[in-house]
Amino acid sequence: MLEVPVWIPILAFAVGLGLGLLIPHLQKPFQRFSTVNDIPKEFFEHERTLRGKVVSVTDGDTIRVRHVPWLANGDGDFKGKLTETTLQLRVAGVDCPETAKFGRTGQPFGEEAKAWLKGELQDQVVSFKLLMKDQYSRAVCLVYYGSWAAPMNVSEELLRHGYANIYRQSGAVYGGLLETFEALEAEAREKRVNIWSLDKRETPAQYKARK
Protein backbone atom coordinates (compact mmCIF):
# COMPACT_ATOMS: atom_id res chain seq x y z
CA MET A 1 0.00 0.00 0.00
CA LEU A 2 1.33 3.40 -0.96
CA GLU A 3 1.89 5.74 1.90
CA VAL A 4 0.17 9.10 1.45
CA PRO A 5 2.59 11.96 2.04
CA VAL A 6 1.67 13.90 5.15
CA TRP A 7 1.44 17.19 3.23
CA ILE A 8 -1.41 16.03 0.95
CA PRO A 9 -4.21 16.03 3.56
CA ILE A 10 -2.86 19.30 4.93
CA LEU A 11 -2.97 20.83 1.44
CA ALA A 12 -6.46 19.45 0.82
CA PHE A 13 -7.66 20.95 4.10
CA ALA A 14 -6.11 24.32 3.27
CA VAL A 15 -7.66 24.35 -0.22
CA GLY A 16 -11.06 23.40 1.17
CA LEU A 17 -10.84 26.09 3.83
CA GLY A 18 -9.78 28.67 1.27
CA LEU A 19 -12.63 27.81 -1.06
CA GLY A 20 -15.08 27.89 1.82
CA LEU A 21 -14.02 31.43 2.63
CA LEU A 22 -13.75 32.57 -0.98
CA ILE A 23 -16.93 31.19 -2.54
CA PRO A 24 -19.33 33.42 -0.55
CA HIS A 25 -17.39 36.48 -1.73
CA LEU A 26 -17.45 35.26 -5.33
CA GLN A 27 -21.19 34.71 -5.13
CA LYS A 28 -22.02 38.21 -3.88
CA PRO A 29 -21.69 40.00 -7.27
CA PHE A 30 -24.23 37.53 -8.68
CA GLN A 31 -26.62 37.65 -5.73
CA ARG A 32 -29.85 39.65 -6.04
CA PHE A 33 -30.45 42.19 -3.30
CA SER A 34 -34.11 42.83 -2.48
CA THR A 35 -33.59 45.98 -0.40
CA VAL A 36 -30.77 48.41 0.33
CA ASN A 37 -30.32 46.82 3.75
CA ASP A 38 -29.41 43.55 2.01
CA ILE A 39 -26.37 45.13 0.34
CA PRO A 40 -23.16 44.24 2.21
CA LYS A 41 -21.42 47.12 3.98
CA GLU A 42 -18.22 46.50 2.02
CA PHE A 43 -20.05 47.26 -1.23
CA PHE A 44 -20.48 50.84 -0.03
CA GLU A 45 -16.96 51.01 1.39
CA HIS A 46 -15.49 49.99 -1.99
CA GLU A 47 -18.05 51.99 -4.01
CA ARG A 48 -19.19 48.97 -5.97
CA THR A 49 -21.29 49.40 -9.10
CA LEU A 50 -24.54 47.45 -9.43
CA ARG A 51 -27.33 47.58 -11.97
CA GLY A 52 -31.08 47.41 -11.86
CA LYS A 53 -34.32 48.09 -13.69
CA VAL A 54 -36.12 51.29 -12.77
CA VAL A 55 -39.64 50.42 -11.64
CA SER A 56 -40.69 53.68 -9.99
CA VAL A 57 -39.71 57.36 -9.95
CA THR A 58 -40.58 58.93 -6.60
CA ASP A 59 -39.48 62.47 -7.41
CA GLY A 60 -36.73 64.28 -9.27
CA ASP A 61 -33.87 62.72 -7.30
CA THR A 62 -35.26 59.46 -5.90
CA ILE A 63 -36.02 56.22 -7.75
CA ARG A 64 -36.72 52.57 -7.02
CA VAL A 65 -34.90 49.87 -8.96
CA ARG A 66 -35.16 46.10 -9.00
CA HIS A 67 -31.61 44.86 -8.66
CA VAL A 68 -30.42 42.85 -11.65
CA PRO A 69 -27.22 40.88 -10.88
CA TRP A 70 -24.50 40.81 -13.52
CA LEU A 71 -25.04 38.10 -16.17
CA ALA A 72 -28.79 38.16 -15.47
CA ASN A 73 -31.49 39.96 -17.44
CA GLY A 74 -34.03 42.44 -16.14
CA ASP A 75 -37.09 40.32 -16.81
CA GLY A 76 -39.02 38.22 -14.34
CA ASP A 77 -42.24 38.14 -12.39
CA PHE A 78 -41.65 39.70 -8.98
CA LYS A 79 -44.43 39.78 -6.44
CA GLY A 80 -44.63 41.72 -3.23
CA LYS A 81 -44.44 45.31 -2.07
CA LEU A 82 -41.98 47.65 -3.74
CA THR A 83 -40.54 48.39 -0.30
CA GLU A 84 -39.66 44.70 0.05
CA THR A 85 -38.46 43.91 -3.49
CA THR A 86 -36.66 47.04 -4.71
CA LEU A 87 -33.74 49.28 -3.84
CA GLN A 88 -34.51 52.92 -3.10
CA LEU A 89 -31.81 55.09 -4.64
CA ARG A 90 -31.09 58.75 -3.88
CA VAL A 91 -29.30 60.46 -6.77
CA ALA A 92 -26.03 61.76 -5.35
CA GLY A 93 -24.94 65.36 -5.10
CA VAL A 94 -28.10 67.11 -6.28
CA ASP A 95 -31.36 68.38 -4.81
CA CYS A 96 -34.52 68.68 -6.91
CA PRO A 97 -37.55 70.81 -6.03
CA GLU A 98 -39.94 69.03 -3.68
CA THR A 99 -43.17 67.56 -5.02
CA ALA A 100 -46.47 67.77 -3.15
CA LYS A 101 -46.50 65.36 -0.20
CA PHE A 102 -48.65 64.82 2.89
CA GLY A 103 -51.04 67.61 1.94
CA ARG A 104 -48.26 70.13 1.48
CA THR A 105 -47.94 72.09 -1.76
CA GLY A 106 -44.88 71.23 -3.81
CA GLN A 107 -42.24 73.61 -5.15
CA PRO A 108 -42.14 75.10 -8.65
CA PHE A 109 -40.61 72.64 -11.13
CA GLY A 110 -40.92 69.73 -8.69
CA GLU A 111 -43.38 67.86 -10.91
CA GLU A 112 -41.45 68.83 -14.04
CA ALA A 113 -38.23 67.39 -12.61
CA LYS A 114 -40.03 64.17 -11.71
CA ALA A 115 -41.65 63.93 -15.16
CA TRP A 116 -38.31 64.50 -16.88
CA LEU A 117 -36.59 61.81 -14.81
CA LYS A 118 -39.44 59.36 -15.41
CA GLY A 119 -39.22 59.98 -19.14
CA GLU A 120 -35.50 59.22 -19.07
CA LEU A 121 -35.39 56.24 -16.70
CA GLN A 122 -38.74 54.45 -16.30
CA ASP A 123 -38.38 50.72 -17.17
CA GLN A 124 -34.74 51.24 -18.16
CA VAL A 125 -31.80 49.21 -16.84
CA VAL A 126 -29.36 51.58 -15.15
CA SER A 127 -26.03 51.13 -13.39
CA PHE A 128 -25.38 52.81 -10.07
CA LYS A 129 -22.21 53.39 -8.09
CA LEU A 130 -22.79 52.99 -4.36
CA LEU A 131 -21.43 55.90 -2.31
CA MET A 132 -23.21 55.61 1.04
CA LYS A 133 -26.41 54.57 2.79
CA ASP A 134 -28.30 57.48 4.30
CA GLN A 135 -30.41 57.73 7.46
CA TYR A 136 -33.51 56.68 5.51
CA SER A 137 -31.85 53.45 4.34
CA ARG A 138 -31.58 54.77 0.80
CA ALA A 139 -28.51 54.05 -1.29
CA VAL A 140 -26.93 57.36 -2.31
CA CYS A 141 -25.51 56.68 -5.77
CA LEU A 142 -24.14 58.04 -8.98
CA VAL A 143 -26.68 56.70 -11.47
CA TYR A 144 -25.84 56.09 -15.13
CA TYR A 145 -28.14 55.36 -18.06
CA GLY A 146 -28.20 55.22 -21.84
CA SER A 147 -25.60 53.66 -24.11
CA TRP A 148 -22.98 51.49 -22.41
CA ALA A 149 -20.37 53.14 -24.63
CA ALA A 150 -21.35 56.67 -23.59
CA PRO A 151 -23.43 56.49 -20.39
CA MET A 152 -25.04 59.64 -19.03
CA ASN A 153 -24.81 60.65 -15.38
CA VAL A 154 -28.26 61.45 -13.92
CA SER A 155 -26.84 64.03 -11.47
CA GLU A 156 -25.12 65.88 -14.30
CA GLU A 157 -28.18 65.81 -16.54
CA LEU A 158 -30.47 67.15 -13.81
CA LEU A 159 -28.07 70.05 -13.24
CA ARG A 160 -27.62 70.64 -16.97
CA HIS A 161 -31.38 70.87 -17.54
CA GLY A 162 -31.94 73.15 -14.56
CA TYR A 163 -34.01 70.66 -12.59
CA ALA A 164 -31.70 70.59 -9.56
CA ASN A 165 -29.17 72.53 -7.59
CA ILE A 166 -26.12 71.02 -5.91
CA TYR A 167 -26.92 69.33 -2.60
CA ARG A 168 -24.74 71.01 0.03
CA GLN A 169 -26.25 69.77 3.28
CA SER A 170 -24.50 67.64 5.89
CA GLY A 171 -23.40 64.27 4.56
CA ALA A 172 -23.31 65.32 0.92
CA VAL A 173 -21.24 63.08 -1.35
CA TYR A 174 -20.26 63.75 -4.94
CA GLY A 175 -18.17 60.79 -6.05
CA GLY A 176 -15.31 63.09 -7.03
CA LEU A 177 -17.51 65.13 -9.40
CA LEU A 178 -18.14 68.32 -7.41
CA GLU A 179 -16.21 70.56 -9.82
CA THR A 180 -18.16 69.15 -12.76
CA PHE A 181 -21.42 69.67 -10.88
CA GLU A 182 -20.49 73.28 -10.06
CA ALA A 183 -19.71 74.05 -13.70
CA LEU A 184 -23.02 72.58 -14.89
CA GLU A 185 -25.00 74.42 -12.20
CA ALA A 186 -23.32 77.72 -13.06
CA GLU A 187 -24.08 77.24 -16.76
CA ALA A 188 -27.76 76.47 -16.12
CA ARG A 189 -28.05 79.46 -13.78
CA GLU A 190 -26.50 81.78 -16.36
CA LYS A 191 -28.94 80.53 -19.01
CA ARG A 192 -31.84 80.82 -16.53
CA VAL A 193 -33.00 77.29 -17.28
CA ASN A 194 -36.08 76.00 -15.42
CA ILE A 195 -35.51 76.49 -11.65
CA TRP A 196 -33.09 79.31 -12.45
CA SER A 197 -35.78 81.19 -14.39
CA LEU A 198 -37.53 82.09 -11.13
CA ASP A 199 -36.95 85.63 -9.85
CA LYS A 200 -37.47 84.48 -6.26
CA ARG A 201 -36.47 80.94 -5.48
CA GLU A 202 -36.43 78.80 -2.37
CA THR A 203 -34.03 75.85 -2.32
CA PRO A 204 -35.36 72.41 -1.39
CA ALA A 205 -33.35 72.64 1.85
CA GLN A 206 -35.01 75.96 2.74
CA TYR A 207 -38.42 74.54 1.86
CA LYS A 208 -37.93 71.52 4.14
CA ALA A 209 -36.62 73.73 6.95
CA ARG A 210 -39.99 75.55 7.00
CA LYS A 211 -41.89 72.42 8.06
UniProtKB/Swiss-Prot annotation:
The entry summarizes how activity is regulated as: The nuclease activity shows a general salt dependency with a clear reduction by magnesium and sulfate ions.
- Reading the lineage from the top rank, the first entry is Eukaryota
Write out the residue ranges of the motif RxLR. 48-51
Subunit structure as annotated in this protein's UniProt entry: Interacts with the host cell surface endoplasmin gp96, in order to get translocated into to host cell. Interacts with the effector Htp1, in order to get released from vesicles into the host cytosol.
Q: Which SMART domains match?
A: SNc
> What is the scientific name of the source organism?
Saprolegnia parasitica (strain CBS 223.65)
Question: SUPFAM superfamilies attached here?
Answer: Staphylococcal nuclease
UniProt region (Binding to the host cell surface), positions on chain: 200-211
Q: Which family does it belong to?
A: In the N-terminal section; belongs to the RxLR effector family.
Q: Where in the cell is it found?
A: Secreted; Host cytoplasm, Host cytosol
Q: Where is the active site?
A: R90, E98, R138
Give yes or no: UniProt keyword Magnesium.
Answer: no
- List, alphabetically, the PANTHER family matched: EBNA2 BINDING PROTEIN P100, SERINE_THREONINE-PROTEIN KINASE 31
What protein does this entry describe? Endonuclease Htp3
